[in-house]
């Protein structure tokens, strides 16, 4: 999953099975860092993600489940992350400002085989408790409610 340029929609019952050729489950940008309104953004991305599961390849692979950068904000509810070196990697000053303003949060999450739950590379001062609550309460996507008849390749 990849968002940018002020995306503010909702994602529900998201199931991501990580593959060898990918290094992240989600990469969320507030604006496109190559083009766009990045010199003085008017809008930041601020999606709401509910019932999310990301299965990685194991914490020894040094991959990130979720990277938030370039000023994105995001609200996560009911998350299950498994098999990553980093659960959340937050980058860039504007992303940190979103955390300090209460515009980025994670509620009800379970971390399995995650080495570091939150990495703060924003320059802003905050800790895990300022972003994440309800550790151990996340069950993730309701996979069984929609997977009947689907096949995996």
PLM regions and their residue ranges:
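Extracellular beta-rich repeat passengers
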Residues: 2-153
């Amino acid at each position: 999953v990849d968002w940018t340029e002020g995306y503010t929609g909702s994602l529900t019952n998201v199931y991501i099975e990580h593959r060898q050729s990918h290094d992240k489950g989600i990469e969320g940008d507030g604006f496109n860092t190559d083009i766009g309104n990045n010199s003085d953004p008017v809008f930041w991305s601020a999606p709401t993600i509910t019932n999310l599961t990301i299965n990685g390849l194991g914490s020894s692979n040094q991959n990130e489940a979720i990277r938030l950068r370039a000023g994105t904000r995001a609200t996560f509810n009911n998350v299950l992350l498994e098999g990553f070196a980093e659960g959340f990697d937050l980058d860039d000053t504007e992303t940190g400002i979103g955390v300090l303003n209460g515009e980025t949060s994670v509620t009800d999450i379970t971390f399995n085989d995650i080495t570091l739950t939150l990495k703060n590379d924003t320059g802003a001062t905050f800790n895990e408790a300022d972003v994440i609550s309800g550790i151990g309460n996340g069950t993730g996507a309701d996979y069984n409610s929609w997977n009947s008849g689907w096949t995996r390749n």
